[in-house]
């Protein structure tokens, strides 16, 4: 426990009985780390500031702060140690395989980081004259060329900052195209039952009604159900390919034909592009818009190492409706056209973000493309699919593949039928994986598979690491079937924090730290 009674480490059940309970609460290098606010101390800041003799005048009146806001004061070494110790409590791709399905948690090459830190990219500002950032603009142009070439699409919007933001961009372009054609009455978007949750959420955000398309027993779009729901009220269909069951939509060309025949557009969720990059061009399949997660397929960092980036490629029909700015190349070099009036052929719906997108991610993704080349990117897809099928093949006798017939694509999907009668749930199994040193796979998604366990190893894992992961899962599966429920119900035992009480977390959430009431500032 820390000084406010919050559990900060696992309780070692046998430590006290064996005389191994430590006096401080720490366990070797597993430090008992408090919140940074709890480390606060008077006059501990690492910077000396000159005294203020008189407060500057202010027009804030009643808004002027009259009490401290509770920011912690720490010295520089205390601050550094705090965050380093916290980092040691987290799993990361730099520690072990990170099998989150539909997330493509591949290695982030250090060469990319070196390139992104070149002063010509890292020290520029989006408001400085464009004549002084020609190198950065040229890199954006080259990245756009690669994205268009790999997808077979004629246009790309670089500025969307994540996958869902890319979905928003694509649907706004689709809405603008329909309105320009006098088809503003089309207010429905179709999406499969296995779709990413962001698909219906984005469609609803744009103002569309979402209608689900049924899935066949083999995990793919039901063409008959799709055809029955198409009509002049439908604006678009949103399909992930490969889909979230880890399967390629074999009827994708027919899906596109039916959609276009009904006057609608085909939006492809490109979250799983890593499985087909260099092998399949979505534009050749009839796709009208697709976002590409640079932080998945093209290895730019996830999460705290981010930010994300989700450029959107567009078909010839949607290209005129791409958001500003547009990158052009003329007598004065590369320029960003900021207004729709700058090009009479375009009728943009506006901007997707301030400035020009995630420049650091552009550099990393472009470095990744250059280091692989076209043949290397093709091998990326092949190895990603190979690794997923190796896991599926090695686990199919102890776990239950959701779709056992035929190969999967980049991720292997299992259901929980193999756990029936064991008293162990998908959640229990995932928590036990933490004790074995692995981040859990994606759980309970897609929703169409009961107790889903979605495993995506990516192409950057060696056979040795895959075998280590497989051995851990086989051992856990054996323990579950042998009735060792205690191993699972209490897991994780060896993580910095134990399992939360989910009922209390839902009913009485503590979402922010609340400081002790501060005394008013002393008047001068």
From Swiss-Prot:
Q: Which domain of life is it from?
A: Bacteria
Cofactor(s) annotated in UniProt: pyridoxal 5'-phosphate
This entry's Gene Ontology molecular function terms read: glycine binding; glycine dehydrogenase (decarboxylating) activity; pyridoxal phosphate binding
What biological process terms from GO does the record include? glycine decarboxylation via glycine cleavage system
**By its UniProt entry, which InterPro entries does this protein fall under?**
Aminotrans_V_dom, GcvPB, GDC-P_C, GDC_P, PyrdxlP-dep_Trfase, PyrdxlP-dep_Trfase_major, PyrdxlP-dep_Trfase_small
The record describes its quaternary structure and partners as: The glycine cleavage system is composed of four proteins: P, T, L and H. In this organism, the P 'protein' is a heterodimer of two subunits.
Mind telling me what this protein is named?
Probable glycine dehydrogenase (decarboxylating) subunit 2
Look up and give the organism this protein is from: Caulobacter vibrioides (strain ATCC 19089 / CIP 103742 / CB 15) (Caulobacter crescentus)
């Amino acid at each position: 426990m820390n000084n406010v009674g919050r559990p900060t480490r696992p309780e070692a059940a046998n430590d006290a009985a064996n005389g191994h309970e430590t006096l401080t609460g720490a366990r070797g290098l597993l430090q008992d780390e408090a919140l940074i606010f709890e480390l606060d101390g008077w006059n501990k800041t690492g910077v000396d500031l000159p005294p203020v003799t008189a407060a500057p005048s202010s027009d804030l009146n009643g808004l002027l702060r009259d009490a401290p806001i509770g920011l912690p004061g720490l010295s520089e070494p205390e601050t550094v140690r705090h965050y380093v110790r916290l980092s040691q409590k987290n799993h990361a791709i730099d520690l072990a395989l990170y099998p989150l399905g539909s997330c493509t948690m591949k290695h982030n090459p250090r060469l990319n980081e070196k390139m992104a830190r070149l002063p010509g990219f890292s020290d520029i500002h989006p408001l400085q004259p464009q004549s002084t950032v020609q190198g950065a603009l040229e890199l954006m142009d080259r990245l756009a060329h690669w994205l268009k070439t790999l997808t077979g699409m004629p246009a790309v919007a670089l500025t969307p900052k994540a996958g869902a933001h890319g979905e928003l961009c694509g649907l706004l372009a689709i809405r603008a195209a329909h309105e320009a054609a006098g088809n503003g009455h089309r207010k429905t978007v179709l999406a499969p039952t296995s779709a990413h949750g962001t698909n219906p959420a984005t469609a609803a955000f744009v103002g569309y009604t979402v209608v689900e398309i049924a899935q066949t027993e083999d995990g793919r779009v039901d063409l008959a159900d799709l055809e029955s729901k198409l009509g002049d009220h439908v604006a678009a269909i949103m399909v992930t390919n490969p889909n979230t069951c880890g399967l390629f939509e074999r009827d994708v060309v027919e899906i596109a034909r039916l959609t276009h025949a009904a006057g609608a557009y085909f939006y492809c969720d490109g979250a799983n592009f890593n499985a087909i990059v260099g092998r399949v061009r979505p534009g050749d399949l009839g796709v009208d818009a697709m976002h590409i997660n640079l932080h998945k397929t093209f290895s730019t960092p996830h999460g705290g190492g981010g930010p994300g980036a989700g450029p959107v490629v567009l078909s010839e029909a949607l290209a005129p409706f791409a958001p500003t700015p547009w990158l052009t190349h003329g007598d004065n070099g590369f320029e960003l056209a900021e207004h729709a009036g700058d090009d009479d052929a375009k009728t943009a719906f506006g901007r997707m973000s301030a400035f020009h997108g995630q420049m650091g991610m552009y550099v990393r993704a472009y470095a990744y493309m250059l280091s692989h080349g076209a043949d290397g990117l093709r091998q990326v897809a092949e190895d990603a699919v190979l690794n997923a099928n190796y896991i599926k093949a090695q686990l199919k006798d102890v776990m239950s593949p959701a779709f056992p017939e035929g190969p999967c694509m980049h991720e292997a999907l299992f259901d929980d039928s193999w756990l029936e009668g064991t008293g162990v749930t998908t959640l229990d199994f995932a928590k036990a994986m933490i004790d074995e040193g692995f981040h859990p796979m994606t759980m309970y998604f897609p929703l169409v598979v009961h107790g889903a366990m979605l495993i995506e190893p990516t192409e950057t894992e060696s056979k040795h690491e895959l075998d280590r992961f497989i051995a851990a899962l086989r051992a856990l599966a054996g323990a579950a079937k042998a009735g060792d429920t205690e191993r699972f119900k209490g897991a994780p035992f060896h993580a910095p924090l134990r399992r939360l009480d989910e009922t209390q977390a839902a009913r009485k959430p503590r979402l922010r730290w609340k400081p002790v009431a501060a005394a008013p500032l002393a008047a001068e």
